Each structure stands twice: as structure tokens, then as C-alpha cells.
Amino acid sequence: MGEYGIAPGQRVAVIWDSSSPVEALKGLVDAVQASVGADSRVSVENINQLCQSAHRESSFDVILSGVVPGSTAQHSAEVLAEIARILKPGGRVLLKEPVVTESENNSQIKTAAKLPAALTLSGLVEVKGLQKEPLTAEEAQSVREHLGYQGNDLLIVQIEGRKPNFEVGSSSQLKLSFAKKTSPSGKPSVDPATAKLWTLSASDMNDEEMDLLDSDELLDSEDLKKPDPASLRAPSCKEKGKKKACKNCTCGLAEELEQEKKSSQPKSACGNCYLGDAFRCASCPYLGDACLQAWREDPAEREPAA
């Protein structure tokens, strides 16, 4: 059947509904069977039983739905999803459905714009309208009887969609190469004029006509003065209270505190502190310490007596 693009050997499904005339359905099935050949079987399914038929995935090359002359089938989202499931990758669906020109409340009939969108949402691609024409008197009467629509703004639309050339959820191995890419044998050519522009030779450096900037001229007398250590102290160093040098102090406070610590070390007045508590004064700061070998001014250098 050149009208529907059916070729010999293809598997075809014809979907009908209660509004399809029996004789017209039989004539369509016979014509499709003649086109595909005796070796191929044509499946005939009622639109209300399609989801319960449990066809295997990717079973049909072509699906014809609602194309029976006089049919007023309405395709729900579930029916369209099932059609997309049982189509083979790259398979085609051709359907007819009555639509309204303007959307109305409480109407189960789609508009001409919503029908292609419904096919796209079901997973079909390359959706395109093939034909749009007014209903015949018989088709309009069938719509009133089976769908209960009494309006006069109906059109019959013939639309086509295609399933993508892959299954939903399918995977494919990617060919990845982790080998190092070989660099080209020859270096890219460089424009001599560009190279000369960005090249400063030694002769240019010694050229008296070259006006080079002396970096020392960028400094004034204030920059060459040694700063006062007090001015380098962090703000926290100037706070009231106990002085405490920062870690890795660079302002000189650490050295100042160390010097104060050394100067505040107690000194022996009698010279007998190293002999032990028996020879120490009552106010001796070393009471309780072990005997010292020899008196040294620096307490860090004192060693207990052997």
C-alpha cells in the first residue's frame, strides 16, 4: 500500500475502535495483508485492549491506528506510549484522529496543536501532520454518538511519527583510547615578522639609542629609609594589657620581650645559692631547687650538682 508506505515483509499492526465499520476494517486488513505478503502476519488490535495484549517490545515495523474509514478513535497517553513501546527502532506509526480547532472545557477531544505534542511526549520523533480536512457527515455523526461532542468545529487529522533508532535504556560501548597522541613531526611555522616583534636581542640591550627604564629611579628617598620597628607592629601589639608576641613575629616585639625576660632574672646576693637550701637565705628564689655545680648568671646554663 503506497498510501501508507508499507513494504513487503514488514510486520504491521492495525488498531481499531468501536466506531470502526466492520466492512471497512476487513477491507483495510485485506489490503495491508496483500502488501506485506503471505509470509508476514498482520495483527489487528482493539484500541481499548492494546495495553493488555502484552506484545513484545519492538514487534512492528508499521502501526496504523484510527485509519479505518469512518473511525473516530481517540488516542490516550497510555495508548501512544504502548504504540511507541511495540514499534521497532525506526518504525513508523500513522494515525487519524478527530480534533477541534479551539480548546473547550470538559472536552476529551484534543486540539490540532496538542495531538503532535502528545506523540512527541510518548517518545516518537519526526512527528508531522500529513492531512487535515473536515469530517464527512458520517464521521460527524459517529463523533456525536461515540464521543458525545455536539460542536461543528471538528477536523480529521492524519499524522505520522517515527520511533528513534534506539531502544529507551539501551547502552552502547564507547571506544576510548588512552594512548598518548603523537605530536606532529614538524613544528608549526612562525611568521618571521611576528618573531622579530617579540624578540629582544643582546645587541638591542647595549644599544645607546634604546631608552630603558632604570628601576632605581622608581624609588624616592622615603622609600630608602629604614622603617621604625614600632611602626611595623601589628595593631594587636599596641593593645593594653599583657604584651604577647605573634607567632613568627617580625616587628621586634619577640626580641624585646626576650630581653626583658633575661633582665628580670633574679641574681644571687650572697653567692651561696648553688650550695643548697642549707646555705640559702629565707627569701632566696631558688629555695627547693637542687644544688648547683657552679653559679652562673644565666639560669638556663645552671646544672644540678652531681
Curated annotation (Swiss-Prot):
Q: Which positions in this protein are listed as binding [4Fe-4S] cluster?
A: 270, 273, 281, 284
The short motif Cx2C motif 2 is annotated over 281-284
Chain positions of motif Cx2C motif 1? 270-273
Record remark on domains: The twin Cx2C motifs are involved in the recognition by the mitochondrial CHCHD4/MIA40-GFER/ERV1 disulfide relay system. The formation of 2 disulfide bonds in the Cx2C motifs through dithiol/disulfide exchange reactions effectively traps the protein in the mitochondrial intermembrane space. The C-terminal domain binds 2 Fe-S clusters but is otherwise mostly in an intrinsically disordered conformation.
**Gene expressing this chain:** CIAPIN1
Q: Where is this region: N-terminal SAM-like domain?
A: 6-172
Region Fe-S binding site B: start-end pairs: 270-284
Which BP terms in the Gene Ontology apply to this protein?
A: apoptotic process; hemopoiesis; iron-sulfur cluster assembly; negative regulation of apoptotic process
**Name used for this protein in its record:** Anamorsin
Instruction: Give the required cofactors.
Output: [2Fe-2S] cluster; [4Fe-4S] cluster
Which region ranges are annotated with the description Linker?
Answer: 173-224
Q: Per the UniProt entry, what species is this protein from, by scientific name?
A: Gallus gallus (Chicken)
